[in-house]
Amino acid sequence: MSYWLCITNRDNWKVVKEKNVWGVPRRHENTMKRVKPGDKLVFYVKQESRKGEVLEPMIVGIFEVVSEPYSDSTKIFKSHTPGETYPIRVKIRPIKIGEVKFKPLIPKLSFIKNKKKWSGHLMGKAMREIPEEDYKLIESLL
């Protein structure tokens, strides 16, 4: 079993929860091909500004993968890139939903090597594998 940190925004987090599906752009297909049924997905929502308010980055849920990756271009996710549908998808089921602030976790997460420039470990990625010890820490706090 593998553990993955899935990086999204609040709009698409709502879609994930409602539809029990996770999707990534085609350029991340090689990463998604490594995802297997039984793997755990930890969802991270990025820091965002909404109406002048800064919404902190958070861990918001853990899901289990229940399908092999598949392709579906049905537009369910929001994207800033015209025509992007996040077509490489897996079906998932919820394990835990909650909110844990991400910044206080940074010193404790082993996959983040550079604690000062931590966002570099997440930028440009849709998802990344994380060690079991980091998964267990996050799960215990959610």
Swiss-Prot record:
Pfam families: EVE (PF01878)
Domain of life according to the entry: Archaea
Membership in a protein family: Belongs to the UPF0310 family.
PANTHER family noted in UniProt: UPF0310 PROTEIN MJECL36
The protein's name in its UniProt record: UPF0310 protein PYRAB08750
Organism: Pyrococcus abyssi (strain GE5 / Orsay)
